[in-house]
Each structure stands twice: as structure tokens, then as C-alpha cells.
Amino acid sequence: MFLFYFSITLAIFSSALYHFTAKSTPSNVNFTVSLLVTYAVAFVVVLLTFIFFPIKNGLAFELKQLNWASIGLAIAVVGIEFGFLLTYRAGWHLGIAAVLTNVVASLILVPVAIFFFKEKISWVNILGILVCLAGLVMLNWKR
């Protein structure tokens, strides 16, 4: 049960930190240099996680277990990084951009979850989707 709550808490706080730091990245810095430093630090942090999640069967064995998803995740992460750096440089507000992208991405993933992962959707879920759509309209309403 600890992992259930810890994992979502980590994701929430990391996402908030991510958007805060992306918005705080100087607008005059080169995107590539910024992300190069980001990924170098991330590499070190990931290496440190071996303390908590040690390799049990050897690195070669673990590498053989990987599939296309690791490459896809890398491409997605770079797209997210560049996308948000550009979004914030273009003048989007922190709260609006984060909510908009997460809600729209979630809406895109609903059919993916249903058709590729055979997840079920209830009427309550459908109502939640409609609330999300209403929220998007309200977020982008001209003031």
C-alpha cells in the first residue's frame, strides 16, 4: 500500500517541480544546452536510484528485457521538454499550460486505454471526461 500512495505523490510533486523549473528556465539560454545539463543531472540521479532498486540479474539481462517503449519514452520526454520550454517562452501561464496539456493528453489516452490496454470505462468516467472538457472551455474563456 505504501508504494501505491508514494508513487502517485512522487509523480504529483515532481510534475509541479517540473513545471516550476521549466517556467523558470532563462529565456535567453539555448534549448539544447539547457536540456543537455538537465539530462546529465537526470543521468546521475537515475544512477543513484540503483541504491534503492539494485540490478538482480545483471545489466545485460535487464537490457535484453527492454522493448520499443524505452526509445518511445525518450522521444516523448524530449518532446515534452522542448514543448514546455517553447510554451512558457511563448507566454503561456504556468497553471493554464500545465492543466491544458495534461487534460488534453488524458483525453487522447482514453481511447488508447480502451482499445490497446482493454481498460474499462464507466458512466462516471464519461461524466468526468465531460467535466474535463467543460474545464478546458472555462480555462480558455476570454476574460
Identify the role of each PLM range.
Residues 23, 85, 113-114:
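Small-residue-mediated transmembrane helix hinge/kink sites in multi-pass secondary transporters
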Residues 106-123:
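C-terminal transmembrane-helix exit sites in multi-pass transporters
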